[in-house]
């Protein structure tokens, strides 16, 4: 004879008989329980709404308010910083312009002083050169006069020697010098 196995009763319980204990069908879809289900649904949503309006929504509103306040503070700080940066930039630009103007003034003053100094040196050099030129011209005139005086003597001596050789007697020295002077004024 066959002995019952410990799982034999379990297998019998697995046999499915259609919804005998519930009266047939899926309970949420039974029309007899709709009114109770709708009532519990309204109560659950009411409680959920009450909890959300008293707990969650104020927390979210507080977070949004804090965030908005932080954003406004950050925007105000950014505006203050921008104003500060603009004023610093303006001060920097004014300072830079003043420095450039001062540098231009210094450069112009330096150019003017160098030009005046160069002009003074040029005038001194021109005066020195004019003095040296006048001295040189005086020396040239003196040497030319000395040389011309020597030429006159040499020419007179040569003319006297030539005439003496040609005619055999020495001509008058004053006449020879007068003849030389006449030939020099013609040229």
UniProtKB/Swiss-Prot annotation:
Any Gene Ontology CC annotation: proton-transporting ATP synthase complex
Residues that span the membrane, as ranges: 32-52
Membrane topology: Single-pass membrane protein
Localization: Cell inner membrane
Coiled coil: none
One annotated GO molecular function: proton-transporting ATP synthase activity, rotational mechanism
Record's keyword annotation contains Cell membrane: yes
Keywords: ATP synthesis, Cell inner membrane, Cell membrane, CF(0), Hydrogen ion transport, Ion transport, Membrane, Transmembrane, Transmembrane helix, Transport
Subunit structure: F-type ATPases have 2 components, F(1) - the catalytic core - and F(0) - the membrane proton channel. F(1) has five subunits: alpha(3), beta(3), gamma(1), delta(1), epsilon(1). F(0) has three main subunits: a(1), b(2) and c(10-14). The alpha and beta chains form an alternating ring which encloses part of the gamma chain. F(1) is attached to F(0) by a central stalk formed by the gamma and epsilon chains, while a peripheral stalk is formed by the delta and b chains.
Reported function: F(1)F(0) ATP synthase produces ATP from ADP in the presence of a proton or sodium gradient. F-type ATPases consist of two structural domains, F(1) containing the extramembraneous catalytic core and F(0) containing the membrane proton channel, linked together by a central stalk and a peripheral stalk. During catalysis, ATP synthesis in the catalytic domain of F(1) is coupled via a rotary mechanism of the central stalk subunits to proton translocation.
NCBIfam families: PRK09174.1 (NF006612)
Family note: Belongs to the ATPase B chain family.
Protein name per its UniProtKB record: ATP synthase subunit b 2
Gene that specifies this protein: atpF2
């Amino acid at each position: 004879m066959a002995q019952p196995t410990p799982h034999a009763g379990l297998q019998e319980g697995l046999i499915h008989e259609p919804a005998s204990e519930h009266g047939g069908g899926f309970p949420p879809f039974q029309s007899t329980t709709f009114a109770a289900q709708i009532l519990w649904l309204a109560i659950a949503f009411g409680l959920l709404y009450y909890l959300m309006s008293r707990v969650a929504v104020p927390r979210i509103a507080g977070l949004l308010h804090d965030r908005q306040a932080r954003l406004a503070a950050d925007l105000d700080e950014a505006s203050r910083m921008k104003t500060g940066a603009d004023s610093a930039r303006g001060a920097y630009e004014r300072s830079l312009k003043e420095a450039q103007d001062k540098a231009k003034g210094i450069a112009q003053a330096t150019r003017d002083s160098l030009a005046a100094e160069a002009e003074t040196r040029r005038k001194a050099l021109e005066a020195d050169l004019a003095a040296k030129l006048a001295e040189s011209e005086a020396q040239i005139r003196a040497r030319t006069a000395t040389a011309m005086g020597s030429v006159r003597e040499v020419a007179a001596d040569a003319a006297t020697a030539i005439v003496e050789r040609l005619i055999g007697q020495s001509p008058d020295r004053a006449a020879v010098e007068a003849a030389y002077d006449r030939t020099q004024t013609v040229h």
